[in-house]
Amino acid sequence: MITVKPGCVTFQNVRKSFGAFTAIPDLSLSIEPGTLVTLLGPSGCGKTTTLRMLAGLEHPTSGRILIGGADVTMLPANERDVSMVFQSYALFPHMTSLDNVAYGLQSSGLGKKEAREKAEEGLKLVGLAGMGHRLPAELSGGQQQRVAVARALVLEPQVLLLDEPLSNLDARLRRRVRTEIRELQQRLGFTAVYVTHDQDEALAVSDRIIVMKDGEIAQSGTPRELYEAPASSFIADFMGEANVIPCEVIGVEGTEALIRVAGVDHRLPGRNAKAGMAKLAVRPGSITIAAAGQQGLAGRVLHSAYLGGHVEYEVETDVGTLFIIDHAVERNLPPSSDVTLGFENRGIALINA
């Protein structure tokens, strides 16, 4: 039987330099046992370097890394109680699925019979029972990914590390496999650290998301917290596309704020708002379109694109060009159409300047 012993993860003032370049200046974070935490950010933000330090594939220049309360800072990878699922899956092409899953168990000293029995259990766990005889080339991309997950899980690590595990799959398969990973993590309760640059993927699988920028934590929180209450323009735009609009907070009453955009006043949710200049992050689907001449923000359609279930517009306004998703496909506004824009109460966040 495969059992898990979920461990906590702690980084204490970790710094990582490559020659004169500092990839991680000063990183401190903690991950609770039994949670799936995603390191999210654009290329070069430091998320993969952070994962590699946790795996023991890189060592920090300074600082401490703890797994399950034990200091593993300078331990080699093979002495850490972690398993890693690589972006390429790293399956041995000449071995069957069963042998791939059993390989790590046998390398760690388990007898061949016991290793194969546990490997069969691992394949069953990921929905590949009866497919242990197949070579990697005889499996689909999604099945290969599940073999890689099974190989990692049978070692019963304190922490499972996943490095962009879905990047080699097509969009439809990515959605299915990310659901399978999340269901498996919740069912077994293991600790997982997941690296991706895909915001939708992070929102779908995570208990908590750590967004990184330039080797530092830009914001950490639940998927809902990051999407609905971004701490900066960078977070607002990175966690799903957002229009960032300059505005002025005229006043705040309870949870509602009076906001002025291009001379037009709006009453909108004002979480933690303060009077003064600010920025308004508005999701493309939270901008309303009405006929020209009404009260609101005047604009002119620059471009439109019909995408079946919705129409995408770029509209020029006094506060810049706004990107809008409109589900009223029958509206079908051609370029140069004059319109009036407004804001819904959902999908909007105030960011203090």
From Swiss-Prot:
- Location of the ABC transporter domain: 9-239
Q: Fetch the PANTHER family from UniProt.
A: SPERMIDINE/PUTRESCINE IMPORT ATP-BINDING PROTEIN POTA (PTHR42781), SPERMIDINE_PUTRESCINE IMPORT ATP-BINDING PROTEIN POTA (PTHR42781:SF4)
What does the UniProt function comment say about this protein?
Part of the ABC transporter complex FbpABC involved in Fe(3+) ions import. Responsible for energy coupling to the transport system.
Q: What class of enzyme is it?
A: translocase
Q: What is the species listed in this Swiss-Prot or TrEMBL entry?
A: Rhizobium etli (strain ATCC 51251 / DSM 11541 / JCM 21823 / NBRC 15573 / CFN 42)
* InterPro entries linked: AAA+_ATPase, ABC_SmlMolc_Importer, ABC_transporter-like_ATP-bd, ABC_transporter-like_CS, Mo/tungstate-bd_C_term_dom, P-loop_NTPase, Transp-assoc_OB_typ2
Query: Can you state which reaction this protein catalyses?
Result: Fe(3+)(out) + ATP + H2O = Fe(3+)(in) + ADP + phosphate + H(+)
> Which SUPFAM superfamilies does this entry report, sorted A to Z?
MOP-like, P-loop containing nucleoside triphosphate hydrolases
Return the protein name.
Fe(3+) ions import ATP-binding protein FbpC
Instruction: Report the EC number(s), separated by commas if there are several.
Output: 7.2.2.7
Give a GO molecular function annotation for the protein. Answer: ATP hydrolysis activity
Q: Which UniProt keywords apply?
A: ATP-binding, Cell inner membrane, Cell membrane, Ion transport, Iron, Iron transport, Membrane, Nucleotide-binding, Translocase, Transport
Q: Where in the cell is it found?
A: Cell inner membrane
Subunit description: The complex is composed of two ATP-binding proteins (FbpC), two transmembrane proteins (FbpB) and a solute-binding protein (FbpA).
Got any disulfides in this one, which pairs?
none
Identify the domain of life: Bacteria
